[in-house]
A protein has these predicted regions:
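Short loop/turn segments that flank or connect secondary-structure elements
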Residues: 1-153
């Protein structure tokens, strides 16, 4: 998937038919991979709105088909480990991609665009992360290196 000149791998789950729910929902409509679900699933039915180098959560009211939902505070709903670090990671990644996209669009240099896109794939998706080390620290180091390579302050 290419978004504004940056290649981003996507996870796409095929459902049984158009409009069908997630294939990982069990007979009771509950997530069967709950402990290992992706980040976007962890916040569902919330979404994110990015503003002023941060983001906030919004409730997507038509996406969840469950009826008679109870009210739950956002802070209780999101059960991501190391929530503060995770939110900083999400913010840093989002605004890094925006900065790269702006820089590449301004350059118009097809070779630079391709080279930068491949470096992002290599640094963040292909090069393995060490499971015995903190993910966020590893990400931060890679982000600093990639910003230097891409000429982003």
């Amino acid at each position: 998937n290419i978004v504004d000149g940056v290649i981003l791998p996507n996870l796409k789950m095929n459902t049984q038919a158009e409009g069908e729910p997630c294939v990982f929902l069990d007979a009771e409509g509950r997530c069967s991979i709950h402990e290992d679900r992706p980040g976007i699933c962890r916040i569902f039915p919330l979404g994110r709105v990015y503003e002023d180098n941060s983001f906030s959560y919004i409730l997507q009211i038509h996406e969840c088909q469950k009826e008679n939902r109870s009210k739950v505070k956002v802070s209780k709903w999101i059960d991501t480990p190391d929530l503060k670090k995770n939110q900083q990671f999400i913010t840093d990644w989002h605004y890094f991609l925006k900065a790269v996209q702006a820089r590449l669009a301004a350059s118009g240099d097809e070779e630079q665009i391709k080279r930068t896109a491949m470096q992002i794939l290599q640094y963040f998706y292909i090069e393995p992360y060490h499971t015995d080390c903190d993910f966020y620290e590893q990400f931060d180091k890679r982000l600093i290196q990639m910003k230097k390579l891409a000429g982003i302050d």
